[in-house]
């Protein structure tokens, strides 16, 4: 589910999104990679990816199926396997791939590397860098603040639900040390 905000405003593309429904947020180009993967267990890798495919809100088609499969070769190898048959790392690759198939303007990654093997973690962070280089805005929620700060332009640090640091990633990194 979604948590309702208590105060303030959420703006995207100059529009107040505070009361927007999930499908409205998605239509504006927001893709969400949830903590816990969120793949469809009874659908194949192919079906999970193809069902998400659509052009971006600006007509972009930067992440077609072939590019997702080149980015995550393991998904190509497991193309006809069900989501439930994949390892945790493969499921996370599938979840990110599915989000990219929507050609988002913004991708939200919630604990994208939690519980994954170190080599998969490195692969996910490599792909996050590629996503950013493509000009897709990323919002990363992760406990590994050093990796986040290495990727980020701006950072916000929460402690017990309160903002304790915010600003340019370099400034936040200097203050977090």
Question: What are the functions of these language-model segments?
Answer:
Residues 107-111:
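Catalytic Walker B motif of ABC-type/P-loop ATPase nucleotide-binding domains
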């Amino acid at each position: 589910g979604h948590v309702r905000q208590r105060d303030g405003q959420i703006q995207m593309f100059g529009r107040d999104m505070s009361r927007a429904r999930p499908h409205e947020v998605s239509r504006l180009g927001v893709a969400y990679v949830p903590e816990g993967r969120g793949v469809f267990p009874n659908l194949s890798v192919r079906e999970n990816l193809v069902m998400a495919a659509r052009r971006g809100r600006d007509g972009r088609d930067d992440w077609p199926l072939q590019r997702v499969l080149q980015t995550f070769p393991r998904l190509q190898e497991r193309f006809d396997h069900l989501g439930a048959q994949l390892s945790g790392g493969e499921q996370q690759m599938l979840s990110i791939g599915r989000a990219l198939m929507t050609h988002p303007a913004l991708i939200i990654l919630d604990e994208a590397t939690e519980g994954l093997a170190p080599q998969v973690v490195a692969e996910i962070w490599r792909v996050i860098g590629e996503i950013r280089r493509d000009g897709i805005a990323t919002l990363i929620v992760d406990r590994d603040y050093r990796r986040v700060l290495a990727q980020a332009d701006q950072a916000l640090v929460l402690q017990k639900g309160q903002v304790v640091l915010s600003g340019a990633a370099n400034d936040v990194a200097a203050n977090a040390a």
